[in-house]
Protein backbone atom coordinates (compact mmCIF):
# COMPACT_ATOMS: atom_id res chain seq x y z
CA UNK A 1 0.00 0.00 0.00
CA UNK A 2 1.39 3.38 -1.03
CA UNK A 3 0.31 6.83 0.11
CA UNK A 4 0.73 10.15 -1.67
CA UNK A 5 2.89 12.73 0.12
CA UNK A 6 4.03 16.24 -0.80
CA UNK A 7 7.58 17.37 -0.02
CA UNK A 8 9.63 20.51 -0.64
CA UNK A 9 13.27 20.03 -1.62
CA UNK A 10 16.26 22.22 -2.35
CA UNK A 11 16.77 22.89 -6.09
CA UNK A 12 20.23 21.32 -6.00
CA UNK A 13 18.79 18.10 -4.56
CA UNK A 14 16.13 18.04 -7.24
CA UNK A 15 18.81 18.51 -9.88
CA UNK A 16 20.75 15.53 -8.52
CA UNK A 17 17.60 13.41 -8.47
CA UNK A 18 16.74 14.37 -12.04
CA UNK A 19 20.17 13.23 -13.23
CA UNK A 20 19.32 9.70 -12.10
CA UNK A 21 16.09 9.54 -14.09
CA UNK A 22 16.75 7.78 -17.39
CA UNK A 23 13.15 7.18 -18.47
CA UNK A 24 13.80 3.45 -18.68
CA UNK A 25 14.67 1.98 -15.29
CA UNK A 26 13.98 5.14 -13.29
CA UNK A 27 10.95 6.81 -14.82
CA UNK A 28 10.21 9.74 -12.49
CA UNK A 29 11.23 11.66 -9.37
CA UNK A 30 8.84 9.74 -7.15
CA UNK A 31 10.43 6.41 -8.01
CA UNK A 32 13.98 7.68 -7.47
CA UNK A 33 13.15 9.37 -4.15
CA UNK A 34 11.49 6.16 -2.91
CA UNK A 35 14.60 4.14 -3.80
CA UNK A 36 16.92 6.62 -2.10
CA UNK A 37 14.80 6.62 1.06
CA UNK A 38 14.64 2.82 1.15
CA UNK A 39 18.42 2.58 0.91
CA UNK A 40 19.10 5.28 3.51
CA UNK A 41 16.58 3.85 6.00
CA UNK A 42 18.02 0.37 5.72
CA UNK A 43 14.97 -1.19 4.09
CA UNK A 44 17.24 -2.42 1.35
CA UNK A 45 16.65 -6.14 1.75
CA UNK A 46 13.55 -8.32 1.61
CA UNK A 47 12.22 -9.34 5.02
CA UNK A 48 11.29 -12.91 4.09
CA UNK A 49 12.93 -15.86 2.37
CA UNK A 50 11.54 -19.10 0.96
CA UNK A 51 13.76 -22.19 0.93
CA UNK A 52 12.74 -24.98 -1.43
CA UNK A 53 13.62 -28.14 0.51
CA UNK A 54 10.93 -30.58 -0.62
CA UNK A 55 12.88 -32.56 -3.25
CA UNK A 56 13.58 -36.28 -3.02
CA UNK A 57 17.30 -36.00 -3.75
CA UNK A 58 17.29 -39.02 -6.05
CA UNK A 59 20.79 -38.27 -7.36
CA UNK A 60 22.08 -38.36 -3.79
CA UNK A 61 20.93 -41.89 -3.07
CA UNK A 62 21.62 -43.86 -0.90
CA UNK A 63 22.29 -40.86 1.38
CA UNK A 64 18.72 -39.62 0.95
CA UNK A 65 16.93 -42.95 1.39
CA UNK A 66 16.15 -42.06 5.00
CA UNK A 67 17.45 -38.51 5.34
CA UNK A 68 16.05 -35.54 3.37
CA UNK A 69 18.79 -33.65 1.55
CA UNK A 70 17.91 -30.57 3.61
CA UNK A 71 19.43 -32.40 6.59
CA UNK A 72 22.59 -33.62 4.88
CA UNK A 73 25.63 -32.09 6.54
CA UNK A 74 28.53 -30.14 5.07
CA UNK A 75 31.36 -29.62 7.53
CA UNK A 76 29.23 -30.57 10.52
CA UNK A 77 26.24 -28.37 9.71
CA UNK A 78 23.15 -29.12 7.62
CA UNK A 79 22.91 -27.54 4.18
CA UNK A 80 19.83 -25.64 5.35
CA UNK A 81 21.69 -24.16 8.32
CA UNK A 82 24.34 -22.80 5.97
CA UNK A 83 21.51 -21.05 4.09
CA UNK A 84 20.21 -19.71 7.41
CA UNK A 85 23.69 -18.28 8.03
CA UNK A 86 23.58 -16.38 4.74
CA UNK A 87 20.15 -14.93 5.48
CA UNK A 88 20.94 -14.05 9.11
CA UNK A 89 24.10 -12.26 8.00
CA UNK A 90 21.82 -9.64 6.43
CA UNK A 91 19.16 -9.67 9.16
CA UNK A 92 16.64 -11.91 7.37
CA UNK A 93 15.06 -14.21 9.96
CA UNK A 94 11.52 -14.88 8.71
CA UNK A 95 11.88 -18.05 6.67
CA UNK A 96 9.37 -20.29 4.92
CA UNK A 97 10.42 -23.88 4.31
CA UNK A 98 8.60 -25.54 1.40
CA UNK A 99 8.69 -29.20 2.41
CA UNK A 100 7.55 -32.47 0.86
CA UNK A 101 9.66 -35.63 0.95
CA UNK A 102 10.37 -36.77 4.54
CA UNK A 103 8.92 -33.47 5.74
CA UNK A 104 8.25 -34.71 9.27
CA UNK A 105 11.98 -35.20 9.80
CA UNK A 106 12.65 -31.66 8.62
CA UNK A 107 9.92 -30.24 10.86
CA UNK A 108 11.14 -32.25 13.84
CA UNK A 109 14.73 -31.06 13.35
CA UNK A 110 14.09 -27.35 12.78
CA UNK A 111 10.84 -26.85 14.69
CA UNK A 112 9.86 -23.20 14.83
CA UNK A 113 13.44 -22.15 14.11
CA UNK A 114 14.12 -20.54 17.49
CA UNK A 115 17.03 -22.91 18.16
CA UNK A 116 18.69 -21.54 15.00
CA UNK A 117 17.88 -17.86 15.50
CA UNK A 118 15.16 -17.74 12.83
CA UNK A 119 11.35 -17.85 12.61
CA UNK A 120 10.16 -20.76 10.48
CA UNK A 121 6.81 -21.24 8.75
CA UNK A 122 6.13 -24.41 6.76
CA UNK A 123 4.42 -24.77 3.38
CA UNK A 124 3.69 -28.46 2.82
CA UNK A 125 3.17 -30.22 -0.50
CA UNK A 126 1.41 -33.59 -0.60
CA UNK A 127 2.78 -34.38 -4.05
CA UNK A 128 5.71 -32.98 -6.05
CA UNK A 129 4.74 -29.55 -7.39
CA UNK A 130 8.05 -28.29 -8.78
CA UNK A 131 9.92 -25.14 -7.83
CA UNK A 132 7.05 -22.84 -8.84
CA UNK A 133 4.20 -25.03 -7.64
CA UNK A 134 5.65 -25.38 -4.16
CA UNK A 135 6.33 -21.64 -4.00
CA UNK A 136 2.68 -20.96 -4.75
CA UNK A 137 1.77 -22.76 -1.51
CA UNK A 138 3.49 -19.94 0.39
CA UNK A 139 1.57 -17.15 -1.37
CA UNK A 140 -0.42 -16.00 1.67
CA UNK A 141 2.80 -15.27 3.56
CA UNK A 142 4.40 -13.15 0.82
CA UNK A 143 3.15 -9.57 0.49
CA UNK A 144 6.31 -7.73 -0.58
CA UNK A 145 9.63 -8.50 -2.27
CA UNK A 146 10.99 -11.85 -1.11
CA UNK A 147 13.91 -14.22 -1.57
CA UNK A 148 13.71 -17.75 -2.94
CA UNK A 149 16.59 -20.21 -2.69
CA UNK A 150 17.03 -23.78 -3.79
CA UNK A 151 17.80 -25.99 -0.83
CA UNK A 152 20.54 -28.10 -2.40
CA UNK A 153 23.19 -25.45 -3.02
CA UNK A 154 25.64 -23.47 -0.92
CA UNK A 155 26.14 -19.86 -1.93
CA UNK A 156 27.62 -16.60 -0.69
CA UNK A 157 25.67 -13.72 -2.24
CA UNK A 158 25.63 -10.03 -1.32
CA UNK A 159 21.88 -9.73 -0.81
CA UNK A 160 21.63 -5.92 -0.31
CA UNK A 161 23.56 -5.29 -3.52
CA UNK A 162 21.41 -7.78 -5.42
CA UNK A 163 18.24 -6.20 -4.05
CA UNK A 164 19.40 -2.71 -5.01
CA UNK A 165 19.83 -3.87 -8.60
CA UNK A 166 16.42 -5.56 -8.48
CA UNK A 167 14.62 -2.41 -7.31
CA UNK A 168 16.50 0.08 -9.47
CA UNK A 169 15.75 -1.96 -12.58
CA UNK A 170 12.08 -2.40 -11.62
CA UNK A 171 12.41 -6.17 -12.04
CA UNK A 172 9.76 -8.74 -11.24
CA UNK A 173 12.51 -11.31 -10.74
CA UNK A 174 16.27 -11.15 -10.34
CA UNK A 175 18.43 -14.25 -10.57
CA UNK A 176 21.84 -14.62 -8.94
CA UNK A 177 24.24 -15.87 -11.61
CA UNK A 178 27.53 -17.71 -11.37
CA UNK A 179 29.85 -19.22 -13.99
CA UNK A 180 30.77 -22.83 -14.73
CA UNK A 181 32.86 -24.51 -17.41
CA UNK A 182 29.99 -26.72 -18.59
CA UNK A 183 26.63 -24.90 -18.35
CA UNK A 184 24.62 -27.63 -20.10
CA UNK A 185 23.33 -29.05 -16.80
CA UNK A 186 21.87 -25.76 -15.58
CA UNK A 187 19.60 -22.88 -16.48
CA UNK A 188 21.65 -20.47 -18.61
CA UNK A 189 21.19 -16.71 -19.03
CA UNK A 190 22.22 -14.32 -21.79
CA UNK A 191 22.55 -10.74 -20.59
CA UNK A 192 22.22 -7.29 -22.11
CA UNK A 193 23.63 -5.19 -19.30
CA UNK A 194 21.77 -6.65 -16.33
CA UNK A 195 18.67 -7.59 -18.32
CA UNK A 196 18.27 -11.28 -19.05
CA UNK A 197 17.23 -11.38 -22.70
CA UNK A 198 17.25 -15.16 -22.92
CA UNK A 199 16.88 -17.87 -20.29
CA UNK A 200 17.17 -21.52 -21.30
CA UNK A 201 17.01 -24.53 -18.99
CA UNK A 202 19.73 -27.16 -19.61
CA UNK A 203 20.44 -26.20 -23.24
CA UNK A 204 22.33 -28.35 -25.73
CA UNK A 205 23.98 -25.18 -27.00
CA UNK A 206 24.32 -22.64 -24.19
CA UNK A 207 24.09 -18.90 -25.00
CA UNK A 208 26.70 -18.16 -22.27
CA UNK A 209 28.41 -19.76 -19.28
CA UNK A 210 26.37 -17.69 -16.81
CA UNK A 211 24.13 -20.09 -14.94
CA UNK A 212 21.25 -19.88 -12.52
CA UNK A 213 22.69 -20.10 -8.99
CA UNK A 214 19.32 -21.06 -7.50
CA UNK A 215 18.87 -17.80 -5.59
CA UNK A 216 16.22 -15.25 -6.55
CA UNK A 217 14.53 -12.04 -5.51
CA UNK A 218 10.90 -12.02 -6.63
CA UNK A 219 7.87 -9.78 -6.48
CA UNK A 220 4.45 -11.16 -5.43
CA UNK A 221 3.16 -10.70 -9.00
CA UNK A 222 5.34 -13.63 -10.04
CA UNK A 223 3.27 -15.98 -7.89
CA UNK A 224 0.16 -14.87 -9.78
CA UNK A 225 1.79 -16.16 -12.98
CA UNK A 226 2.13 -19.70 -11.60
CA UNK A 227 -0.49 -22.18 -12.79
CA UNK A 228 -2.04 -24.78 -10.50
CA UNK A 229 -0.32 -28.14 -10.16
CA UNK A 230 3.24 -28.96 -11.14
CA UNK A 231 5.19 -25.96 -12.43
CA UNK A 232 8.84 -24.91 -12.66
CA UNK A 233 10.22 -21.41 -12.24
CA UNK A 234 13.08 -22.27 -14.55
CA UNK A 235 10.99 -23.56 -17.47
CA UNK A 236 7.57 -21.99 -17.05
CA UNK A 237 8.12 -18.58 -15.47
CA UNK A 238 11.61 -17.17 -16.10
CA UNK A 239 11.47 -17.45 -19.93
CA UNK A 240 8.17 -15.50 -19.88
CA UNK A 241 9.66 -12.81 -17.67
CA UNK A 242 12.66 -12.53 -19.99
CA UNK A 243 10.34 -11.88 -22.93
CA UNK A 244 8.52 -9.25 -20.86
CA UNK A 245 11.82 -7.49 -20.12
CA UNK A 246 11.25 -7.86 -16.36
CA UNK A 247 13.97 -10.44 -15.58
CA UNK A 248 17.37 -9.28 -14.33
CA UNK A 249 20.63 -11.07 -13.62
CA UNK A 250 23.07 -10.48 -10.77
CA UNK A 251 26.48 -12.08 -11.45
CA UNK A 252 28.41 -12.70 -8.25
CA UNK A 253 31.88 -14.04 -7.50
CA UNK A 254 31.21 -15.53 -4.07
CA UNK A 255 31.48 -19.25 -3.51
CA UNK A 256 28.77 -21.48 -4.96
CA UNK A 257 28.40 -25.25 -4.78
CA UNK A 258 25.72 -27.44 -6.31
CA UNK A 259 25.15 -30.43 -4.03
CA UNK A 260 22.82 -32.24 -6.42
CA UNK A 261 24.82 -35.47 -6.66
CA UNK A 262 27.35 -37.46 -4.65
CA UNK A 263 30.41 -36.18 -6.50
CA UNK A 264 29.46 -32.51 -6.08
CA UNK A 265 28.50 -33.11 -2.46
CA UNK A 266 31.99 -34.42 -1.72
CA UNK A 267 33.57 -31.39 -3.41
CA UNK A 268 31.48 -29.02 -1.29
CA UNK A 269 32.49 -30.88 1.87
CA UNK A 270 36.14 -30.23 1.06
CA UNK A 271 36.04 -26.70 -0.37
CA UNK A 272 33.16 -24.76 1.16
CA UNK A 273 34.50 -21.83 3.20
CA UNK A 274 31.31 -20.79 4.94
CA UNK A 275 29.58 -17.43 4.69
CA UNK A 276 32.56 -15.14 4.12
CA UNK A 277 32.17 -11.63 2.63
CA UNK A 278 33.65 -11.38 -0.85
CA UNK A 279 31.93 -8.11 -1.66
CA UNK A 280 34.84 -6.53 -3.48
CA UNK A 281 34.72 -9.29 -6.09
CA UNK A 282 31.03 -9.03 -6.91
CA UNK A 283 29.78 -7.43 -10.10
CA UNK A 284 27.28 -4.60 -9.71
CA UNK A 285 25.43 -4.04 -12.97
CA UNK A 286 23.49 -0.85 -12.35
Regions flagged by a language model, labelled:
Residues 26-27, 146-147, 154, 160-167, ...:
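Catalytic-core segments of class I nucleotidyltransferases/pyrophosphorylases
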Residues 2-4, 11-26, 31, 35-51, ...:
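Conserved N-terminal catalytic core of the sugar/cofactor nucleotidyltransferase
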Residues 80, 106, 138, 152, ...:
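Residue-level signal for inorganic ion chemistry
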Residues 56, 152-153:
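Active-site metal-binding loops of divalent metal-dependent hydrolases
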Residues 169-179:
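A short, conserved acidic/glycine-rich loop-to-beta-strand motif
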Residues 71, 188-191, 238, 249:
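A structural signal for short hydrophobic beta-strand segments in well-ordered beta-sheet cores
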Residues 123-125, 176, 250-252:
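Conserved beta-strand termini and adjacent loop/short-helix elements that scaffold enzyme active sites
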